[in-house]
Amino acid sequence: MNFWLQEQAQSNGNRLAIVTNQLSLTYEELYHRAKTIAEYLTSLNQKRIGLYISNDIDSVVLIHACWLAHIEIAMINTRLTRHEMINQMNSVDIATIVHTLPLELEGFNLYHFNDLTQLDKHDVSGYKFNLESIASIMFTSGTTGPQKAVPQTFNNHLASAKGCKQSLGFEQNTVWLSVLPIYHISGLSVILRAVIEGFTVRLVKKFQTDDMLTQIKTYPITHMSLVPQTLKWLMDAGLTQPFSLEKILLGGAKLSPQLIEQALTYRLPVYNSFGMTETCSQFLTASPQMLKERFDTVGKPSENVEVKIKNPNAYGHGELLIKGENVMNGYLYPKYLKDTFDNDGYFQTGDIAEIDDEGYVIIYDRRKDLIISGGENIYPYQIETIAKDFEGIEDAVCVGISDDTWGQVPILYYVTNQDINQTELIEHFENHLARYKIPKKYYQVKSLPYTSTGKLQRKKVKSEDLNEGKNNES
């Protein structure tokens, strides 16, 4: 079969494929550029290369060129240290890295995108497209152990795109505003959905509130992918009506009830979702109607996806397991990980969840973020939600710290520009939580660490000294 991009060039050649503030390409133009670069890439004689790229047109051309040349791509997070990059690339036997951003990294063959045309050309027109071959390799955070390399096949991506279309909905007239980095699955999946369906992606290099608002107001944007914090920034800056937006896909972090209520008040078409690198993006999606019925749900599984709860406790809480064609076959590195799949072939996500009587899935926390205090499970998100409901608290995060008596106890960092009465805050928790769940220490801080795309860096909260403000113990 032909590659998706070639099929779109033949059937929808004049349709816009990629648009930025500087440039735009139709599907025919994108295909011809990618095919030309693919002919140069074959001279590298590499089965697999690393990509150090950005949200720009050259990077999208490069991705498709690699696939046309039958080259697997290992995506490099541009925020990593040199040491982290080297370890990742070595773990999956990468010798060559192609980059669209400035890069100096010892021990690898480096080629800037603009220099590829100095290589010899070889014809790629006879190459056949195999759905079962590896398309991309991404790395999980490695916070609970070794860095994990996730191989994603074209069929995994196709199944994910089909599931997204079924649960969210998109068509050839869709215009998807995408600011999430394409080296992450949330960003790359938009590029793949587009080339499979034939819609237009409006690509944004970096999240800037004013620029995003201008694009939403100016262009016929129908779809947009965000994390909850960036939606909050947009609403605070003036996104108080949907304009042409039909779907706002949220993921990557918990949705607070306050944010949902505000978004629905503005009639914003918010869809909460849940997915992983290992599942090629979302496999659970909650529509606005579902969120009205149950604000804390991530919805129901996509078509052809099965989910279940492993060893549920008395409350129905247990580890979420998933099975489907969107799920990877196993890690490339480390190759032999225990407890990746159960005996029935379900992938074990490491997330604590519940499936209610209506079939809605509720994610409580990552298993690694769970606080176990005196044998009791404490979900940080529950504490954070109640904290944000206290007047004057703008943001909050709960983490566990070691305790000689209980093993772990919860503490709270919160952001406010008001004078918070600590006694009243503790009383607020006492009215809503069992005593063992109430934070034992409180830190008022100026801000919490977020990535440029608005995702809370919980790992930094645990490792860095944020205690720049008031400290009180309960």
Swiss-Prot record:
The keyword Ribosomal protein does not apply. It comes from Staphylococcus epidermidis (strain ATCC 35984 / DSM 28319 / BCRC 17069 / CCUG 31568 / BM 3577 / RP62A). Gene3D superfamilies: 3.30.300.30, N-terminal domain of ligase-like. Pathway: Quinol/quinone metabolism; 1,4-dihydroxy-2-naphthoate biosynthesis; 1,4-dihydroxy-2-naphthoate from chorismate: step 5/7; Quinol/quinone metabolism; menaquinone biosynthesis. Pfam families: AMP-binding (PF00501), AMP-binding_C (PF13193). The keyword Transmembrane helix does not apply. This is 2-succinylbenzoate--CoA ligase. It catalyses: 2-succinylbenzoate + ATP + CoA = 2-succinylbenzoyl-CoA + AMP + diphosphate. HAMAP family: MenE.
